[in-house]
């Protein structure tokens, strides 16, 4: 009696499953990396929006700081910006700052990524990314 040899051996199936697992792992790493880049781009755009709003506020008022605008949440109400992770808005207080306005601290809920704008630089996690003209002076 002859048996036909149709199908795959167990070793062949295990090799295929291992290859699929490796490809899935690589795809997942690339996907999460792209997600983080997109979130960072949103936060940078939000920081630019805040810069524009604060400069407009300083041009419209006689105040040299924007404490009220930042502290009471009206800045975020005016801009409609949000943190891509859905976390709370966090802002630095500008009390006591003369001349240069130190404005934005945006933090993700996990607390691992943050972007800061001050009068001299735009930074991510404390490292300079590029300089910006947020030195809105009265």
Regions found by a protein language model. Give the residues of each.
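Generic low-polarity alpha-helical segments
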Residues: 1, 43, 116-119
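Short intrinsically disordered, low-complexity coil segments enriched in acidic
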Residues: 1-2, 135
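Short, low-complexity interaction segments enriched in Ser/Thr/Pro/Gly
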Residues: 2-3, 36, 75, 89
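N-terminal single-pass transmembrane signal-anchor helix
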Residues: 3-31
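Generic cytosolic/nucleocytoplasmic N-terminal low-complexity/intrinsically disordered segments
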Residues: 4-5, 43-45, 77, 91
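Glycine-centered flexibility motif
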Residues: 15, 33, 82-86
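Conserved hydrophobic/amphipathic alpha-helical signal-anchor segments
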Residues: 33-72
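Periplasmic/extracellular, small/polar-rich flexible segments of pilin-like filament-forming proteins
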Residues: 56-138
């Amino acid at each position: 009696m002859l048996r036909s040899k149709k199908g795959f051996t167990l070793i062949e199936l295990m090799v295929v499953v291992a290859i699929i697992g490796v490809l899935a792992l690589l795809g997942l790493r690339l996907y999460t990396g792209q997600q983080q880049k997109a979130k960072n781009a949103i936060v940078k755009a939000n920081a630019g929006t805040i810069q524009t709003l604060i400069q407009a506020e300083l041009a419209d008022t006689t105040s040299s700081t924007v404490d009220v605008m930042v502290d009471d949440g009206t800045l975020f109400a005016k801009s409609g910006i949000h943190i891509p992770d859905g976390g709370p808005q966090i802002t630095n207080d500008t009390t006591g700052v003369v001349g240069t306005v130190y404005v934005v601290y945006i933090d993700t809920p996990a607390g691992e990524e943050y972007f800061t704008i001050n009068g001299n630089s735009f930074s991510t996690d404390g490292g300079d990314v590029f300089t910006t003209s947020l030195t809105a002076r009265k």
